[in-house]
């Protein structure tokens, strides 16, 4: 328990101690969230509004120039935007020119293409002789033609026959209606299917009662009705 109390005291002391000197900083932390850091710089540098997060951001970046306007708009300072320090640019990003690495893929040397036409006497899949000097030369047969050549006989020219005159086209006769090959036959009568639900007469809710005579309004007619 005493350790937690000591830790809480040290934490409160760290927040209560004045901050190290910083340009544009009054030396204390104001935990008010009513004004932002950029507005306080433009309004009054003596009453600077800072929070621990805003003080840390002001330590790692240069403060806004006091031109009387904000460069990024009024809504930016309500969001946490991590900004890298511009005072110490990384040195490993810039390489000397002789250490430049090409971005594109390395170009492979172009292999000269061999002719696709097979050499007579050699198969396209078998290697040539000059690539195998130690092997004995194989017996090669002379290139033979698949069919013996025959002398071309001169053809006798036949006399050209006269062209016959074209006959006139006959008129097309109307097509007669043909009887259908398979006349439509009436289907045989099908048997009636039994009803799915049996239709039984439902008993009337009110039984049929004989109508009663209306009572006569006149005394003389009442006797006749009775």
Curated annotation (Swiss-Prot):
Cystine residue pairs: none
Broad class of where this protein is predominantly found: secreted
GO CC aspect terms: extracellular region
Compartment list: Secreted, Extracellular space, Extracellular matrix
SMART domains: Amelogenin
UniProt cross-references to Pfam families, sorted A to Z: Amelogenin (PF02948)
Cited InterPro entries: Amelogenin
GO molecular function: structural constituent of tooth enamel
Biased composition (Pro residues): 183-192
Signal peptide coordinates: 1-16
Region called Disordered, residue ranges: 86-196
Phosphoserine: residues carrying this PTM: 32
A single BP term in Gene Ontology: enamel mineralization
PANTHER family, A to Z: AMELOGENIN, X ISOFORM, AMELOGENIN, Y ISOFORM
Protein's job: Plays a role in the biomineralization of teeth. Seems to regulate the formation of crystallites during the secretory stage of tooth enamel development. Thought to play a major role in the structural organization and mineralization of developing enamel.
Entry similarity comment: Belongs to the amelogenin family.
Descriptive protein name: Amelogenin
Lineage: Eukaryota, Metazoa, Chordata, Craniata, Vertebrata
Encoding gene (name): AMEL
């Amino acid at each position: 328990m005493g350790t937690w109390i000591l830790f809480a005291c040290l934490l409160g002391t760290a927040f209560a101690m004045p901050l190290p000197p910083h340009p544009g900083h009054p030396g204390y932390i104001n935990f008010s969230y009513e004004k932002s850091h950029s507005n306080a710089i433009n309004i009054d540098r003596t009453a600077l509004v800072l929070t621990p997060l805003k003080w840390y951001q002001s330590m790692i970046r240069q403060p806004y120039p006091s031109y009387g306007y904000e460069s990024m708009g009024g809504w930016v300072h309500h969001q946490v935007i991590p900004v890298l320090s511009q005072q110490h640019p990384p040195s490993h990003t810039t390489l000397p020119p002789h250490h430049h690495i090409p971005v594109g893929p390395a170009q492979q040397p172009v292999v000269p293409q061999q002719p696709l036409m097979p050499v007579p006497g050699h198969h396209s899949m078998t290697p040539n002789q000059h690539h195998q000097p130690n092997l004995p030369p194989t017996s090669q047969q002379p290139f033979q033609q698949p069919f013996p050549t025959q002398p071309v006989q001169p053809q006798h020219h036949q006399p050209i026959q006269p062209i016959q005159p074209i006959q006139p086209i006959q008129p097309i006769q109307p097509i007669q209606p043909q009887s259908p090959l398979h006349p439509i036959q009436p289907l045989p009568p099908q048997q009636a299917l039994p009803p799915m639900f049996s239709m039984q007469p439902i008993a009337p809710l009110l039984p049929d009662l004989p109508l009663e005579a209306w009572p006569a309004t006149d005394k003389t007619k009442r006797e006749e009705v009775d």
